[in-house]
């Protein structure tokens, strides 16, 4: 669903980058919705970043290359109002614990499920928080420590 929405948004010549967020104004890298929503960007915007960036390390925090300056036109997608992502969960795949949680979800829900299905599943299985809890603070610490230099010329 969100892939289609992002593709549609990128057809607008006034948009270079689209991602999920909890605000229409300011990017929040720790918002849980990011684990569910892919980001999309135009090839022209990516080429421009590659030309202007001052660092070779662009792995951690790549979205901020698009959101931390006025060069790129960014659009944020808000989650549907009835979708509430619990703070004690994360849905990215950065650590082995993330993958372990993903395997549990997929083994129970199969390959075709929605965000709502996942949220209902974790509500019915609150013990799953124990899988992911050790990496919540670790991710925040690692993110701050390893975030790329977003400076561009």
Where are the regions that the model predicts?
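Alpha-helix boundary/capping and short turn/kink residues
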Residues: 55, 111-112
